[in-house]
Amino acid sequence: MLCAICNVSSGNCAEDCAYCTQSAHIKADIPKFKQKNLEQILNEAKIASKNYALGFCLVTSGLGLDDKKLEFICEAATMLRKETPNLMLIACNGSASYESLKELKKVGIFSYNHNLETSREFFPQICTTHSWDDRFNTNLNAKKAGLELCCGGIYGLGESQDDRLSFRASLKELNPFSSPINFFIPNPALKIKQPLLSTDEALEIIRDTAKTLPQCRIMVAGGREIVLGDRQYEILENGASAIVIGDYLTTSGEVASKDIEELRNRGFEFASQCH
């Protein structure tokens, strides 16, 4: 399964997540803009569809889904359901109430992405402006609203093996439809100063996640190209069944045509429906 990301709004986030270059607490050299227009979003959706993406995720920066943001995401989703009906729409808009998530469900959003990021115990070391429990509760709200969950996190922040076990146990409790795995990429502007994970450790993380969540679609996302390099397609032999195709929020991804060619050469077919 291939999924693409649309960075609807970028940067200037008031939260202090230590792994994120979109935080206004640091000065990272990233694109910053308030909001893409509907035409830009539609163009990206059409490109994603041509690249065999099944999922298309509408991502906004900031703490949560306020009324103004909700209205725009609903407008964008309504347009995309009409213009690109083959895409399964995912929303990633931060903390959200049950009532707001019900509105997303009504306009055809299939899944809500809100990552736990790491263990409950380790989270205070990487973020102080909101709590891990806020994230967990938003996922509960999404389930209650009838949305599928897309919930995962990021590895390589300095967390311990016990943290990883605790994190995956929490994911198992939520039982998400899909679970993205991101690998931390160092950036001089970030407070976290951790080296890249080794390729072998990254593949082990994927295997361990797949064992913990056997019914879940394990998606390898940010850091795939840099951490795994020329071994990146081994993820599909180690428990992953989905990848993000194209660019990420603030970093470039693998060239889509290369991913498509490499996957085809390995005998993979691209999913045309979520199941």
Curated annotation (Swiss-Prot):
Keywords: 2Fe-2S, 4Fe-4S, Biotin biosynthesis, Iron, Iron-sulfur, Metal-binding, S-adenosyl-L-methionine, Transferase. Residues 1-217 form the Radical SAM core domain. It catalyses: (4R,5S)-dethiobiotin + (sulfur carrier)-SH + 2 reduced [2Fe-2S]-[ferredoxin] + 2 S-adenosyl-L-methionine = (sulfur carrier)-H + biotin + 2 5'-deoxyadenosine + 2 L-methionine + 2 oxidized [2Fe-2S]-[ferredoxin]. It holds the Pfam family Radical_SAM. GO terms for biological process: biotin biosynthetic process. InterPro entries: Aldolase_TIM (IPR013785), BATS_dom (IPR010722), Biotin_synth/BioAB (IPR002684), Biotin_synthase (IPR024177), Elp3/MiaA/NifB-like_rSAM (IPR006638), rSAM (IPR007197). Binds 1 [4Fe-4S] cluster. The cluster is coordinated with 3 cysteines and an exchangeable S-adenosyl-L-methionine. Binds 1 [2Fe-2S] cluster. The cluster is coordinated with 3 cysteines and 1 arginine. Its EC number is 2.8.1.6. Its cofactor is [4Fe-4S] cluster; [2Fe-2S] cluster. Pathway: Cofactor biosynthesis; biotin biosynthesis; biotin from 7,8-diaminononanoate: step 2/2. One of its GO terms (molecular function) is 4 iron, 4 sulfur cluster binding. It is an enzyme of class 2 (transferase). [4Fe-4S] cluster binds at residues 13, 17, 20. SUPFAM superfamilies: Radical SAM enzymes. [2Fe-2S] cluster binds at residues 57, 92, 150, 217. It comes from the Bacteria. Homodimer. Catalyzes the conversion of dethiobiotin (DTB) to biotin by the insertion of a sulfur atom into dethiobiotin via a radical-based mechanism. Belongs to the radical SAM superfamily. Biotin synthase family. PANTHER family: BIOTIN SYNTHASE, BIOTIN SYNTHASE, MITOCHONDRIAL. This is Biotin synthase. It comes from Campylobacter fetus subsp. fetus (strain 82-40). The gene is bioB.
